[in-house]
Amino acid sequence: MHDLIMSMAEVDISLDIGTKAVRLARAAASSYLRNEKLPDPPADPIFQEKHGVFTTINTYPGNTLRGCIGFPEPYYPLGEGIIRSSIYAATEDPRFEPMKIDEISHVTFEVSILTQPVEITVNPEDRPKAVHIGRDGLIAVYNGASGLLLPQVATEYRMNPEEFLEALCEKAGLWEGCWKYKKVKISKFQATVFGEKDPEGVVEKR
């Protein structure tokens, strides 16, 4: 059977699917931290389609980042990608200590399902005009270094396109204004985002 890789335009991601995605992320991290059998993905066909995906874990209350890891490219079927990214966000984000099981009821889970990244091919000085705040996430790649910012980052910190691009350069460990250079590859993607309002609570589309 051929691999299924579909663009977001071809898939209507409902709140029901988003809720299942977030529940799967929480169940995967919880099971891993308890040394229990990992959950199986839901049976819905979309969980067998390949998508880029990120899992973000935030503290509750407080809403501060606790972990965020994922796959910008559609390497895995969505269900497997959610399971992997959730476990990695909980235990392997180098910015934080690995989560302990007693934290699981004090964090919220958010899942971002990504479209295929597309390179921004305009002249570098025009890149800000190609970035739509609130819709686009960004990826920078140069000489083995890379960085990614999800669309919600720009919204949360009220960035304009130039500020978002500067933050991307910093995230990638590159120099200030790196986005102004053609040798730095900048790509954009969109994400459909679902997250818990509170731990194990109602899931909303963001």
Curated annotation (Swiss-Prot):
The protein's name: Protein Ta0236
PANTHER family referenced in this protein's UniProt entry, alphabetically: AMME SYNDROME CANDIDATE GENE 1 PROTEIN (PTHR13016:SF0), AMMECR1 HOMOLOG (PTHR13016)
Leader sequence segment: none
NCBIfam families, alphabetized: AmmeMemoSam_A, TIGR00296 family protein
Ranges where the AMMECR1 domain occurs: 16-205
